[in-house]
A protein has these predicted regions:
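Short beta-strand/loop segments at the ligand-binding rim of alpha/beta enzyme cores
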Residues: 17-26
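Alpha/beta catalytic cores of nucleotide-metabolism and tRNA/nucleoside-modifying enzymes
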Residues: 16-17, 32-178
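Gly/Ser-rich catalytic serine loop of serine hydrolases
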Residues: 26-32
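Single conserved hydrophobic/aromatic residue that forms the stacking wall/gate
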Residues: 1-7, 11
Length: 178
């Protein structure tokens, strides 16, 4: 199993040794509050990935966006089923089948995508057409922050929410030292 560390432990180990070198925090940052927390621990900024996947402008299939909006953080898994390398994605019967004891070992990259992607593209096409079994199988890369991504909004609204959350968190922290 792949183990995770608390974000504060990771930031402490990864940021402190570099002194004045700007470091971006990444992983699980889907709100302005989380960005402010990372910066309070020493990061110079944040790299945000998953939060953009449920935006209106995202290329992600609507069926998968719906699954992401409904998901919680425990409904992701690091799996080699898609690329041959560990990547976090939605848990589905597809990922569970590849993780089963009786499953074949995923092929190394670049071979596993040659096996997985044609099948997953077919799954997505069927899911978009309303096929219930395909909807269950459909998966996509997404981080554990998915549990906080509860609606599909525009990218500009994501930026605005980040800004407001960040400012509120910053002001709250500032009040502790004032």
């Amino acid at each position: 199993p792949i183990h995770s560390s608390a974000a504060s432990d990771v930031y402490k180990r990864q940021i402190q040794p570099y002194g004045d070198v700007p470091i971006l925090a990444a992983g699980g940052i889907v709100t302005g509050k989380q960005m402010a927390a990372a910066m309070a621990m020493g990061a110079s900024g944040a790299w945000c990935g998953s939060v953009w996947l449920t935006t209106i402008e995202s290329e992600v299939e609507p069926v998968i966006k719906e699954k992401m909006v409904a998901a919680n953080s425990s409904q992701t898994v690091r799996s080699r089923s898609r690329t041959g390398k560990h990547s976090r994605q939605l848990v589905t019967p597809w990922t569970q089948a590849w993780e089963a004891d009786s499953a074949p070992e995923p092929l190394p990259m670049p071979l596993q995508p040659m096996v997985a992607e044609p099948a997953l593209q077919k799954v997505n096409k069927l899911a978009a057409g309303g096929h219930e079994g395909a909807k269950d199988l459909a998966t996509y890369w997404v981080g554990q922050g998915v549990g906080l991504m509860n609606q599909s909004i525009s990218a500009s609204d994501v930026v605005q929410e980040f800004k407001e959350d960040f400012i509120n968190a910053f002001e709250r922290l500032n009040n502790f030292v004032s």
